[in-house]
C-alpha cells in the first residue's frame, strides 16, 4: 500500500494531553485511534490491520481445537437477563450495561457479554448428548457503561472482544475442555508476541466455580498479581490466599478500658497507646443491597494490620442469602448513619455491637450479619472499639460464636506473605493488564434458562457450560506497553500493521524513484506486507513517523541507490546495515522469519 493514495498517516507531533499511560499516548500520537468521546474511539485504517491480524491468530487457534465461529446480536431483551437474575445487577446503581426502551416500551440492553443469548440458543438447538461437546465463539464490539473510562482501549465504553461459550454433557468434560482452551490462549498470546502469566481469578458477575485470568505484566496495569518466584502459585489479588504474619502478643499490664479521644484510626490508637496494629481488631460496616431492595447491614472484622478484600466479602455475603446481591457499599457517611442507626460510635465500634443500634424505622434488616476473618478470630486477646465514643476496650477470650459470627477469608493477601504452612515461599507482586479470562460456569445459566439435553440413559440434564473471553483491542494496547521505546512503538511482527516500510529519501531523484518502485513491486509479488511512504516530505519527517508507528523493518533508499544499495533497519533490534538490492528480498525474508519463529 502507498501512504499517499490508500493509507494516509495521521501522526501527531505533540503528545496528547488526555493520555495517561504510554500505550494510550502512542496509539493517539501514531494515528492508530482517534477519540470521539470519553471511552469511545475510532479505529483508523492502520489500527484495523492490527486488529485483523490479532483476530486471525485467535481464529486459527480456536478453530484448531474444534470451535466454530458465529455472530450474536448486540441488542438483548431484558427478559433473558431477568431469567438469569443479572438484569438488576447490570443496570441498577453502578451497573455497566447500557439499557434502553424501544417504541413499544420493551426493555433492552447493549451486550457487555453473551451468556444469556447463547444459552437460550443452546436450549433450542442442543437436545442430545450426541451433539456434545460444542463450542461457539465470536469477535464483536461490546459495550460497557464504565463509570470512569480511562487508559484508552484498556477501559473504554466500546471495545472489540472475542467471547466463546462451550457446552458439555459432564463436569469432567467441561474441565478437560477448559484446560484445552487455556493452552490455546497461551499459544494465542505467544503468537501475538506477548509475555503473559496465567493467574487464579475471581469469577465476578459472570459466575462459575473457577476461573483463570491471563495477564500481561506491565507497570501501567490496573490489576495486582501475587506470585511465587518458583512459579508454583499465581493469583489476582482479588482471589489470592496466604498466611498473614504472626501477631505481636499484648502485654499483661494493659488496662481493660483505654481512653482514646479523637483516635479513630488504627494508626492513631497504636501511636498513642504503645500498641501494634496486629493487636487490634478493626470493625467495618457495609450495606449489602439485594435484588428487590432488600438491605442487610454487615459487620466485618479483620486484624488491624490487614485490609478487607471487598471482592471476597461480596462473594461470601452472596452465598449466605437466597437473594441476588447487587451492591456492597462501605458505610461511612454521616447522613446514612444518622438515618439508620442510633447511638452509633463510628470509629469506636467493637465486635460485640448490639443489634439494637439499628433503628426500628430503618429499611435495613434489624440484625447485623457478622463476618470475621481468621486473622482476627484466632486472637484470644485483642483491643477493639468499646462501642462508646473516645473509648477502646481490651477483649479476652471473646466468643465470636456467641455473637453468630461467620468465619471466612475476607483478607487481602499481600507481598511478603507466606503461601501456606506447607509452603513457606513468599509472595511477590507485579502489576498486570488482563487480556483474557476463562471460566468454568457449571450449570448456572443452563438451570435458569432451562437448557437441557437427553443423556445416554434418556434422562434430561442441565448442560455444563464454559465461557472464554479475550480483549482484542486490549491485546493491541498491551503489546505496546511491552514493546516501545523513546521513539515510539516496536510492534511484534505477528500483529504489526505491516512487516516492512519502504522510505525513499528523495523521490525527485529518478534513480531513487525507479529503485523504490522495483523494490516495492518485488515485495508485493512475493506477498510481503509492505507499506511505501511515497510522500514528498523531508526524509527526517518520514524517519520520525516510521519510528513512531513501529513497523518492524524499514528499507531506506538514499544516495547509495546509485550503487544499487539500500539500508535495512530492524526497528525491534535497532540494528541497521547496507545491503545490495539483489540480496535484499532474501535477507529480509530470513530476518523476518527469525522474528516470527521467536514467538511461534
From Swiss-Prot:
Keywords: Aminoacyl-tRNA synthetase, ATP-binding, Cytoplasm, Ligase, Nucleotide-binding, Protein biosynthesis. It comes from Prochlorococcus marinus (strain MIT 9215). Belongs to the class-II aminoacyl-tRNA synthetase family. ProS type 1 subfamily. It is found in: Cytoplasm. This is Proline--tRNA ligase. One of its GO terms (cellular component) is cytosol. It is an enzyme of class 6 (ligase). Homodimer. InterPro entries: aa-tRNA-synt_IIb, aa-tRNA-synth_II, aa-tRNA-synth_II/BPL/LPL, Anticodon-bd, Anticodon-bd_dom_sf, Pro-tRNA-ligase_IIa, Pro-tRNA-synth_IIa_bac-type, Pro-tRNA-Synthase_IIa_type1. Its EC number is 6.1.1.15. Consists of three domains: the N-terminal catalytic domain, the editing domain and the C-terminal anticodon-binding domain. GO terms for biological process: prolyl-tRNA aminoacylation.
